[in-house]
Amino acid sequence: MTTRVTLISPAMNPAVREARFDDGCSLDAAGAARARSAADEVRPAAAALVSPAVRCRQTAAALGLHVRDEPALAGLDMGRWRGLTLDEAAAREPEALARWLADPAARPHGGESVHLLCARVGGWLDEAARTSGRLVAVVEPEVVRAATVRVLGAPEDAFWRIDVAPLTATAFTGRAGRWNLAPGTALGRTDRTPAERPGR
């Protein structure tokens, strides 16, 4: 029994362009257009899921996916740092930010810790591995990071060393309790053959 999970990061929005923690803003025009152009690159799946975030919902709609909410795949709750840049958080609470970046269990912003996020996403992956077929989900970049940490059996501080670009598809294939990872593939390009498209 093989399970294939494809996690798609959302397209560009102002928070990404300005390097801010997401604050619920919509996709910008370029991000929405790129997502629409990628609609035929996403293969049909037995189930299509989405993070509750606005930019994830809008990306899923632009891709033509008929999705249902999956709370277990929600993004990291940044508490009172929501909408701030890293520099702004550092200026307001330098010691708290340093602690957060150094300790996956820390949550000085009053939201969710990286440790809790990794546990939540890892639990969802464990459940997904009990089913066969193809799943696709549009999720926040930090969810892709957390899934990668779990699949590779990496320490949680490796979370910070994983980059996830906007509108990329990362595939995880699970069988007999073991996952394999196919690194993120950019969507919305026109210079790939059908065989190179994500999920092939």
Regions of interest found by a model, annotated:
Residues 5, 131-142:
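Generic beta-sheet signal
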Residues 141-145, 174:
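GST superfamily/GST-like fold recognition
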Residues 1-4, 38, 76-88, 149-200:
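Acidic, low-complexity terminal tails and accessory targeting/binding regions
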Residues 42-72, 98, 173-200:
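Conserved histidine-centered catalytic loops in small-molecule metabolism enzymes
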Residues 50-51, 119, 138-139:
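Short beta-strand scaffold positions
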Residues 63-120, 183:
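Phosphate-handling substructures
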Residues 2-68, 110:
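Active-site-proximal alpha-helix that buttresses catalytic centers in soluble enzyme cores
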